Structures are given as C-alpha cells and as structure tokens.
C-alpha cells in the first residue's frame, strides 16, 4: 500500500475525502489543507487520473528536525535518492515555510538541492540536472516550525491544470475549485446547467466532464511520477486506456445540456476554444449576451440549475453597479427560472444578500487568498408575496418620503443640487445628495464598536434601496466614504476621471465633479448664504477667502458686484473657480483669482472691500500655511485682520462648520465690531434636521450707518 497526501483548497477537505473514498482509498484522514490516504499502486494512478478536487498528490518520504541548515541538509541526504530516480532525470525543488534558521525559501531549496545532488556524487554517480520549468521529478519540502516534511510530488504540475484551458478571462477559477463548486451546487447530472456569467467557461466545462464521465487528468501531457524509479508504465497505460473508454461512452450517453452566457464576445470565443480543447464542444452552447437580458433557454423543458461565479468589486466605485447587478439578477431568477436551483459562489456575501433570496445551504471555501461563500437557493415555481429579506425598508420609506417633499421644493427654488437624506435614521448613517440626474451617497465612517461586516451590509442595503426608490441606473450613483477631515484632506484627489458637468443653483451655473475629489465642488449647506451674497453685492467690491471653487464669487458677480477677488491656496480649485466664472460670463480684470495662504495674505493686504465672505476651515495645520489655525481659538485675530480691509459701511459674512462655536462678543466689542448671527436664515429645507452643520454671522463696524 502507498501512503499518500492529497492537498486541496481550504474548505474542500471533506469533499476531497469523500471523493478519494469513492475511488477506493483507505484510511482517509482529514488535516487542514488536505487528506492523508492509503491506496494500492493501481488506485494510486487512478486517484491521480480521476481526482477532480486535489491540488497535488504527494508521496511522503520522511520528516526531519531542522534546528540548523545542516540538519536540513543531512535529513534530505539520508534519503536514498538514486533509488528514487536516475541521474539522467531532471529534478526541481519546491520549498515552502520558514523558521529561525531557514529564513529564505530559496536558500532552503538550495540546501535541499545540494543534498540530493551530493547523494548521487557520493556514490560516484553522475549528478542530475535541475529543470525548474518541467522536471521529471519534483521534490516538495514543507517546513513547519522545526520540522521539515519531504515528499515526491507525483502530480508534476498542479492537478488543476487539466490541459484544456489555454484561454482564460480576467479572474479565472482554478479547475479543481470549479469542480468543487459544481459538486456543491445541487446540480444533478442529466439535468440542464446554465451559467449566466460564464467567463472562460470553467464551471460549465468541469460540469460537462462530470456528466460525461471524463477523467480530469485525461489530457495532461506531463506527470510527476513518470521519472520515478517505481513507475509502472503498463499499469498506468491500463488506467489511461480505461479513462479513454469511459469518456467515449460517457459523452455518447450524457443527456445533460449546458448553456453559458457572457456579455464579452472575446471571452465567449475563449470559452468555446476551451470547451473544444476539452473535447466537450458538442455539449456546451456559449452565447454572447448580457446577463440582464437573460431568459430561460429551456422555459418549457426540464428543471435545472443556474450556477455562476458573479463579479465582485474591491474598488469602492464599483460597488453600486455590482449591487444593482445582483438585485437585477435576483429578479431575473424569480421571473424566468421558477422551480430551478440557483447556486452562486462569491467573495462578497453582502452582494449575495442583494438577490433578496433566502439561501437553503451555504458552504465556505478559499479562492486563493480570498474567503468565499457558496450559497444554494431553491427558486419558487410561482413566486408570490414579499421578497425574502426586505432590504433597508425603514431607510427606503424615509427616503421615499423625503424625495417626494424635496424634489418639488427644489424645482420651485430652481436648484439641481440638494440633500434628500442626512443620517435621518441611526442605523443608516449616510448622506444622500442629488446632483441633477446623479446621486452621491456619502457613508460616514462607522464607530469602531460597529462590526465592519454589519456596517458594510447596511451600506449595500442602502445602495440597493436608493437605486430602487429613485429608479436610478447604477452608473449614475457615486459612493464616497467620509471621515473626519484632517489638515489638507479636503484637497485629496480620489481619482483622475475628470468628469465635470454643469448644474444650476438659482440663477448661477456651476461645474461639479462627483468622482475625483472627496467634495464635489459645491457645499450644499451654504446655498442660501451664496444667494444672500448675490443679493448684497450690487455695486460692491467683493472678497472671497478660502474660496474653494469660487461659487460664492459667481453669485456675487451675477448680483452685480463691481469687482470680485477670489483667493484660495489650491491651484486646482482656483482653476475650477475660473471655469465657474467663465461659465457665467464673468471674466476680465474686475474678476481676480489669486493663489495664496489666506491668513498670510490677510495680514499683508492693504486693499479695501465692501463685502467679504470667509468660510475658514475648523482646523488646519497645512505645511503650506505658516502656522496652525483653530477657528474657535483664532477667530478674533481673524476679525482683527478683516476689520482693516473692511470699508466703513462694509459687511463680513463669516461662516464655519465648528459644532458648538462660541462667538467672543466681548472681544468683538473691543475690536469695534458687531456680530449678528444669521444661521437660521441660511439653513434650507434639505438641511432642516442638521441645524449644526454650520453657523453664520454678519460682521459690521460698530456704529455702522
């Protein structure tokens, strides 16, 4: 009997054990990452030929303690390598694992290689050559703490390499994992199988191999045992001949039908080539088609299974589209595949929840480094009633109510950018803003006490509900995560798309960009303040400090300001401000834009203005500023500098976002200034719930006429 070890992906050990026992293996013992088992010579070859789930099959040789590199060398050399293979065979060493003395896997492999070569030369035999690409013999060494396990790799290349797949998509599944997904899906051989997002066709091809009794190793050209001294060519020939005969009979007898779809014609071409290479082209029909147009190819035929590995996203900006895709996929399944089974394999259980289906079974597995889940669903024949798991129902109802009221108000006001939801419900801590026919969802960072998986699930529910309530295409939704800003974070670039579009705010037109920056180019809560500035500016010299994209200057210019001066430290935002001014026909020498540290400029300026708008940061310690700034601590110093620039009958509109800001009235009186709070006058309906989003003041000289 041969004692072997079959490795597999984490989570598939039990499935592999059942497969090996079905092949006739004895004494099967599961360990993490594989199964130890015992077989005769014939069953050894059959397990290599027929295992659909094993990654590799190893013949353990010995174990040795490794407290020094010499221990490793001697432990390997103790094996009679010339009895394993002859000098004319090539070999390679795969070494994994580190400890305190073997700190580099390449060094470990080198010591093993030296020990093997020396075992030949010590017997005055020619030294075998190393071939890292396609050796006759592969030696596998795994170092776990202070123990090295040494084995012959009978597989050669990984067993997932069946030989049919020269063409793959962007994110292919390994064939042995695909086979496991098929086996766990609930699909029964003889029934139809549909993959609506098939990519390079691996799931369908593996299923067709099962249905047609085709051995997964039948097309492999190279094995790790053919250079082994104990290789029995006659026995292997019998195993191979039997596999060919079973495949010939199986493809003639199978009644299963397989259907694969993908929206990329090039990917479908690759899938067809792979199926042809596998000898299964006649069983699988591949069609170029968007999943959203999917219907049941056997609407009047037998009940089958829909099986797929749908896309998932690691980038934040891909999530709205994927959430919408999964929601639509769930509706398609319920509409066209009643009575069928559905099985989906994904690295994102949150996305699977968007199907609004209740899973009957689920399995876990690793796909490389990714933790994945496979969920099986039984689709009702005649679906009725509410879907399983109404997503964010409270949020959806509140959003629906808000939109009904605010959309009408916005049309009457002549504005296209406004907030429709502002963390109204504690469980759904997001802000939702409309920008024309676009929507931005800003997720406020969850407290550390909230389970990240739970927070992510709620966000997915919010996105799905928003798309549904607003009847919004996913490509019109932008997702942002907002955390407490520090320093220059408001200037942080998020992307390079450069997607600007025009929106209306009263009589002004403004450019917004929803994707490239944390902020969009217009602060919605200051909308009424900008309108007031426009009404106050006729015939006046207007100064806009910390101007951002200059939207206040646009309103002042349209209101008839004699001059506008727009100052910000960011060149990017000043260029944006210039575009906004030009968009509204405001150009010429009377409309100045200056890049400067606003606080330094204030201290040095000797100009006079009638109307000044200043909206400084709550706190800033930018490297480009000479010193830190705290609006609560430093607002009197700020007012002292502003007073010097303010004409006798002039007005400063001072706003900030500091919660709990307290105006130093005594200090203002000492400066000869009067402050009148106008916060309630600058708050609009869409920010009615958040009275502390900003505070706003009109500052004048004491005794102003």
From Swiss-Prot:
Pfam families: Methyltrans_SAM, RlmL_1st, THUMP, UPF0020. CDD domains: AdoMet_MTases, THUMP_AdoMetMT. GO terms for cellular component: cytoplasm. It is found in: Cytoplasm. Signal peptide: none annotated. One of its GO terms (molecular function) is rRNA (guanine-N7-)-methyltransferase activity. It catalyses: guanosine(2445) in 23S rRNA + S-adenosyl-L-methionine = N(2)-methylguanosine(2445) in 23S rRNA + S-adenosyl-L-homocysteine + H(+); guanosine(2069) in 23S rRNA + S-adenosyl-L-methionine = N(2)-methylguanosine(2069) in 23S rRNA + S-adenosyl-L-homocysteine + H(+). Its EC number is 2.1.1.173, 2.1.1.264. Keywords: Cytoplasm, Methyltransferase, RNA-binding, rRNA processing, S-adenosyl-L-methionine, Transferase. Residues 43-154 form the THUMP domain. Specifically methylates the guanine in position 2445 (m2G2445) and the guanine in position 2069 (m7G2069) of 23S rRNA. HAMAP family: 23SrRNA_methyltr_KL. Belongs to the methyltransferase superfamily. RlmKL family. This is Ribosomal RNA large subunit methyltransferase K/L. It comes from Erwinia tasmaniensis (strain DSM 17950 / CFBP 7177 / CIP 109463 / NCPPB 4357 / Et1/99). The lineage of its organism: Bacteria, Pseudomonadati, Pseudomonadota, Gammaproteobacteria, Enterobacterales. The gene is rlmL.
């Amino acid at each position: 009997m041969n004692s072997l070890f079959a490795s597999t992906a984490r989570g598939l050990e039990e499935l592999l054990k059942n497969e090996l026992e079905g092949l006739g293996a004895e004494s099967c013992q599961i360990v993490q990452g594989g199964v130890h088992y015992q077989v005769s010579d014939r069953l050894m070859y059959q397990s290599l030929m027929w295992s659909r789930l094993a990654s590799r099959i190893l013949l353990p040789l010995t174990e040795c303690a490794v407290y020094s590199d010499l221990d490793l060398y001697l432990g390997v050399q103790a094996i009679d390598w010339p009895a394993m293979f002859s000098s004319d065979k090539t070999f390679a060493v795969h070494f994994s694992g580190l400890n305190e003395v073997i700190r580099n896997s390449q060094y470990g492999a080198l010591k093993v290689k030296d020990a093997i070569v020396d075992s030949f030369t010590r017997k005055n035999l020619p030294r075998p050559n190393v071939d890292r690409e396609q050796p006759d013999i592969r030696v596998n060494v795994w170092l776990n703490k202070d123990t090295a396990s040494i084995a012959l790799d009978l597989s050669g290349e990984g067993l997932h390499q069946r030989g049919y797949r020269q063409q793959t998509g962007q994110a292919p599944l390994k064939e042995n994992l695909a086979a496991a997904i098929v086996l766990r899906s609930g699909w029964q051989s003889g029934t139809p199988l549909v993959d609506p997002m098939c990519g390079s066709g691996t799931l369908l091809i593996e299923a067709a191999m099962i249905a047609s009794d085709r051995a997964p190793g039948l097309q492999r050209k190279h094995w790790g045992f053919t250079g082994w001294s104990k290789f029995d060519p006659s026995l292997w020939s019998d195993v191979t001949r039997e596999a060919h005969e079973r495949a010939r009979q199986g493809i003639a007898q199978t009644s299963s039908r397989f259907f694969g779809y993908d929206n990329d014609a090039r990917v479908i071409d690759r899938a067809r080539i792979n199926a042809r290479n596998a000898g299964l082209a006649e069983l699988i029909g591949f069609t170029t088609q968007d999943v959203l147009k999917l219907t049941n190819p056997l609407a009047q035929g037998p009940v089958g299974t829909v099986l797929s590995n749908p896309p998932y996203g690691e980038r934040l900006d891909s999530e709205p589209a994927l959430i919408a895709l999964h929601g639509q996929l769930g509706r398609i399944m319920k509409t066209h595949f009643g009575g069928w089974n559905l099985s989906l394999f994904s690295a994102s259980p949150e996305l699977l929840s968007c199907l609004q289906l209740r899973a009957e079974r689920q399995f876990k597995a690793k796909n490389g480094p990714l933790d994945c889940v496979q969920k099986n669903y039984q689709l009702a024949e005649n679906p009725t009633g509410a879907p399983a798991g109404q997503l964010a129902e409270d949020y959806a109802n509140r959003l629906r109510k808000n939109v009904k009221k605010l959309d009408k108000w916005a049309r009457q006001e002549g504005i296209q950018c406004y907030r429709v939801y502002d963390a109204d419900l504690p469980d759904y801590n997001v802000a939702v803003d409309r920008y024309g026919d676009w929507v931005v969802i800003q997720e406020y960072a969850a407290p550390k006490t909230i389970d990240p998986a739970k927070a992510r699930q709620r966000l997915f529910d919010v996105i799905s509900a928003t798309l549904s309530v607003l009847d919004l295409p996913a490509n019109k939704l932008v997702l942002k995560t907002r955390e407490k800003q520090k320093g220059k974070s408001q200037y942080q670039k998020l992307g390079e798309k450069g997607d600007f579009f025009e929106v209306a705010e009263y009589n002004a037109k403004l450019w917004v960009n929803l994707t490239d920056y944390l902020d969009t180019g217009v602060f919605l809560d200051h909308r009424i303040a900008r309108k007031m500035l426009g009404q106050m500016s006729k015939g006046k010299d207007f100064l806009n400090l910390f101007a951002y994209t200059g939207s206040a200057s646009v309103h002042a210019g349209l209101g008839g300001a004699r001059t506008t001066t727009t100052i910000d430290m960011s060149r990017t935002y000043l260029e944006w401000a210039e575009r906004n001014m030009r968009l509204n026909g405001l150009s010429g020498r009377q409309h100045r834009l200056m890049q400067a540290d606003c606080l330094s400029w204030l201290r040095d300026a000797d100009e006079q203005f009638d109307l000044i708008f200043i909206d400084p940061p709550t706190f800033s310690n930018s490297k480009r500023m000479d010193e830190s700034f705290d609006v609560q601590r430093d607002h009197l110093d700020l007012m002292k500098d502003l007073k010097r620039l303010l004409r006798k009958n002039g007005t400063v509109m001072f706003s900030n976002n500091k919660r709990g800001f307290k105006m130093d009235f005594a200090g203002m009186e000492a400066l000869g200034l009067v402050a009148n709070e106008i916060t309630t006058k600058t708050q609009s309906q869409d920010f009615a719930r958040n009275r502390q989003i900003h505070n706003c003041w009109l500052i004048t000289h004491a005794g102003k006429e």
